[in-house]
Amino acid sequence: MSNQTTVTEFLILGFSDIWELQILYFIVFLVLYLISLLGNLLIITAIALNRHLHNPMYFFLINLSILDFGYISVTIPKSMANSLMNTSLISYYGCVAQVFFYIFFASANFALLTIMAYDRYIAICQPLHYEMLMNRRACVQMAASAWISGILCSALHTGNTFAISFCGGNMVDQFFCEIPQLLHLACSDSYLGEVVVISLFMLLSLICFAFIIVSYVQIFKTVLRIPSQEGRHKAFSTCLPHLIVVSLFLFTGTFAFLKPTSNSTSDLNPLVAVLYSIMPPMMNPIIYSMRNKEMKGALSKLIGWKLFSKNKMSIFLH
């Protein structure tokens, strides 16, 4: 116990300690962050302004966009600030907050994707009961349950992680405070901690994943029984974006928690983290805007209206 020291801050090693490369990473992260910010903001605005999209599916999509924006905002701004100021420091409590909110947004995101699968199941397999089962109160309660489950899951993960002692080692081989890397700095054997973290993650993931799979099996069986090709295409078009988003989230989430911590190549850790911490919130708006006809129309109308307003204003000023 005499060799233990209190850790008051962590060093986020990130990608490189070379100033020129840090500026390059700052520019790349800024572009990715702005793409995610603009994409999710357009989704939210387009749905809010289009009365035809005021239904449960798009209500959940607004929640997803908010969670996506929070998810990427937990890690990217701090990393960009460190790169710009040529520093690697983050305070102990700053690291605690980053871990808490990162797990919160990730867990709530997955819970919401599960709810969205249920919404598509009711819409396609039980259309006559859709308005009764997916009324406004039910939708608000389901969305709230996703956010609350994120808080509970995050509290468990964060509490388990920071209950351990750090023996003076404070260098985190990542561009943000990541649980597997923090457990690697533990004084005592962190094997039990890693098992608890991975077990909790896998339990939540398996429950949600099983629910999503069962929902889509029923959806596909129902869609294949639709006699008209146009009807089948319309049903698939509302499900395909969600299915792609779920696959992307699960694929990248598997990288996050199942990659080895002790034997992983340090140079690859930040690059792999980009895959699961930046790509989903950046790609989700693109997937929904490209694969959903109603969303594409709403976005085109929104962007066209803004361009028209700008042109009209410029003509008026001249």
Language-model region placement:
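Transmembrane helical core of 7TM receptor-like proteins
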Residues: 1-318
